[in-house]
Amino acid sequence: MFETLKALNPDPILGLLAAYRQDPNPRKVDLGVGVYKDEAGHTPILECVKQADLAHRAEETTKTYVGPAGDADFDNGIEALIFGADHGARRDQRLRTLQAPGGCGALRIAAELLNRAKAGAAIWVSDPTWANHVPLLGDAGLEIKIYPYYDGASQSLKADAMFAALEQIPAGDLVLLHGCCHNPCGVDLAPADWDRVAEIAVRRGFTPFVDLAYLGLGVGLDEDAYGVRRLASAVPELLVASSCSKNFGVYRERVGALSLLCATPAQADVVFGQAQNVARGVYSMPPNYGAALVGRILRDPAATKAWEGELGAMRDRINGLRSQLSGKF
């Protein structure tokens, strides 16, 4: 059986990391895998995560399954963090959120769900986009299409070309948008751009799908969530795949979520059930430990404040290093 399989080329991201490790140049800079490092080149565990870990270990009484939707405290906490606790979509009970194994798990569950809803649906991704978007979405059966986004020569957004492309996308298609900290180009939509995207989406009838992997690491939590919140206030349907790997530093715990906005609460219940059914057939139950820690932090105001302080320190360091690096060229 296995003799039919062919050797694959190295993953473009992981292959770059391997090349970096083999390069003897002492002045090399690692711009590969998106992992935060401190001044010593170490990826630390946040103090708030350590404290949540201690409390969780002291109180945990079982290792039984949590169900396909995952940890309820985490689901509620991450939804409130992304959309805002008092967002109209939450008040109207049109939002549902389920835990997933990282942002990748959320993307794949969304893709499988969308293909179940409309087989072979077209999803438009930015040029460029994160390398793993194409296999995660395309291998689930979605048709990948591309819209212009970044001008490498001017290092700026191709705003006119992007909006012109969005104006041609038909109803029933999906548009993948980077919520903040666009990977790989780093050029984000301004609030006015998000306003225009929302207006076009409503008028044209396409469904926005936001990948939110870096919430809080761009400008700030509320600023980085502007696009998602603006879309959720305008469109009848929206998908958001989020990750806690970067902003909580829980990379190996695989903590992510898929949030689904639907036109009515009844439709939201149906879609939520379908999403859990998809998850049941892919990985059955999500891992609980990391999500339990994040959920604990988000339900405790003091712990949340401590996390926001640590997140701000990471954000300031990242932005400072980016500024220093750009000054070298």
Residue positions per predicted region:
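N-terminal "arm"/small-domain region of PLP-dependent enzymes with the aminotransferase-like
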Residues: 1-70, 77-80, 287, 291
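Conserved C-terminal alpha-helix-loop-beta "cap" of PLP-dependent enzymes
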Residues: 17-24, 119-120, 134, 264-284, ...
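Hydrophobic/aromatic beta-strand patches that form the interior of the parallel beta-sheet core
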Residues: 29, 124, 145, 209, ...
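A cross-domain feature marking catalytic cores of carbohydrate-active enzymes
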Residues: 33, 179, 210-212
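Short catalytic/ligand-binding loop motif for oxyanion handling, primarily in non-cytosolic enzymes
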Residues: 37-41, 184-185, 249-250
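Conserved core of the PLP fold type I
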Residues: 55, 60-203, 216-217, 226
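Acidic, glycine-rich loop-and-beta core segments that form the ion-binding/anion-interacting portion
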Residues: 189-250
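Conserved core segment of the aminotransferase class I/II
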Residues: 233-308
